């Protein structure tokens, strides 16, 4: 059996590790709320922009619109935007996106297309750059804000827009993690370009808040509040032509779509980290409990051995 001092030192080490993982869990839980608030704050702009596009759509056929962002040309090159994080300790969050990107890349190559990658996050960059002979990397972005901002989305949007408009790529897809709940995050593929603003709809969001129960911090979920805005008047008059409006609004719509993907990915990363740290804390607690039992058994065995030696010496 292990030395008593070794077991005691390991118990102390495990308990200290549990303090760290518990602190990381609480920090991630608080940041999930911050990321969620960012999504809710950006929603009014997204809703109004969608309504304006819907109004324009009702007055013209998008298929007939003279906008390069809507043109569906023959597809030869497809750009994949892979969104991961800059840090680990978040379960399978980064690995799932990387696997999904590899699978999609192989699918497109097998179908005769020429895929390339735009990598967002250090984890994706590090993985695919180490395999640069197998993958064509177009651009990389790292060290974005923990809660993505419109500036982050704008820099990436400028890159993909330039490539699409110059016909260096014919389609752009984003692979990100859709935030479903604190325990469910799904890798998702969404086509960014060419744009198709039809069927715009916001799925129901959930909001999460820290509270206490039985002296323990817990997280409650609730439905996000929705504010019904009045629809734009049907007789509203636009000074510019529909084509001019589309050319001005569609880049904003694209940027908003990408921002939403970045925000959902950030929330998913934080939720995954919170879950991973919660599991680590539980495992550390169980390990400390088992080590304490081993320590007590070893201590009892040592005391029994000493008693036997004393009794044996007295008998002699």
From Swiss-Prot:
Pfam families: ATP-synt (PF00231)
Protein name as annotated: ATP synthase gamma chain
Family of the protein in this entry: Belongs to the ATPase gamma chain family.
Subcellular location per the Swiss-Prot or TrEMBL entry: Cellular thylakoid membrane
Molecular function terms from GO: ATP binding; proton-transporting ATP synthase activity, rotational mechanism
HAMAP family per record: ATP_synth_gamma_bact
Record bears the keyword Transport: yes
An example Gene Ontology CC term for this record: plasma membrane-derived thylakoid membrane
Topology relative to the membrane: Peripheral membrane protein
Main function: Produces ATP from ADP in the presence of a proton gradient across the membrane. The gamma chain is believed to be important in regulating ATPase activity and the flow of protons through the CF(0) complex.
Predominant location: membrane
Keywords: ATP synthesis, CF(1), Hydrogen ion transport, Ion transport, Membrane, Thylakoid, Transport
PROSITE patterns named among the record's database cross-references: ATPASE_GAMMA
Signal peptide: none
Subunit structure, interactors included: F-type ATPases have 2 components, CF(1) - the catalytic core - and CF(0) - the membrane proton channel. CF(1) has five subunits: alpha(3), beta(3), gamma(1), delta(1), epsilon(1). CF(0) has three main subunits: a, b and c.
Record has Transcription as a keyword: no
């Amino acid at each position: 059996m292990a030395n008593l001092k070794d077991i005691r030192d390991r118990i102390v080490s495990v308990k200290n590790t549990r303090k760290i993982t518990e602190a990381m869990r609480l920090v991630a839980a608080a940041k999930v709320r911050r990321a969620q608030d960012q999504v809710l704050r950006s929603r009014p702009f997204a809703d109004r922009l969608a309504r304006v596009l819907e109004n324009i759509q009702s007055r013209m056929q998008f298929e007939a619109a003279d906008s390069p962002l809507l043109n569906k040309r023959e597809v030869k090159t497809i750009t994949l935007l892979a969104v991961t994080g800059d840090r680990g300790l978040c379960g399978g969050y980064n690995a799932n996106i990387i696997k999904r990107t590899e699978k999609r890349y192989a699918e497109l190559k097998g179908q005769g297309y020429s895929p390339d990658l735009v990598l967002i996050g250090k984890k994706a960059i590090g993985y695919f750059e180490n395999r640069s002979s197998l993958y064509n990397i177009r651009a990389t972005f790292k060290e974005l804000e923990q809660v993505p901002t419109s500036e982050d989305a704008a820099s990436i949007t400028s890159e993909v827009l330039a490539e699409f408009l110059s016909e260096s790529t014919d389609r752009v897809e984003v692979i990100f993690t859709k935030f479903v709940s604190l325990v469910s995050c799904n890798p998702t593929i969404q086509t960014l370009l060419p744009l198709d603003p039809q069927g715009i709809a916001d799925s129901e969001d959930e909001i999460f808040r820290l509270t206490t129960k039985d002296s323990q911090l817990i997280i409650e979920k609730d439905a996000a509040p929705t504010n019904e805005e009045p629809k734009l008047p049907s007789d509203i008059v636009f000074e510019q032509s529909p084509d001019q409006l589309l050319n001005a609004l569609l880049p904003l719509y694209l940027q908003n779509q990408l921002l939403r993907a970045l925000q959902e990915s950030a929330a998913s990363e934080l939720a995954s980290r919170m879950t991973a740290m919660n599991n680590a804390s539980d495992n550390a607690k169980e390990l400390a409990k088992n080590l304490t039992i081993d320590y007590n058994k070893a201590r009892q065995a040592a005391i029994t051995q000493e008693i036997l030696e004393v009794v044996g010496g007295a008998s002699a």
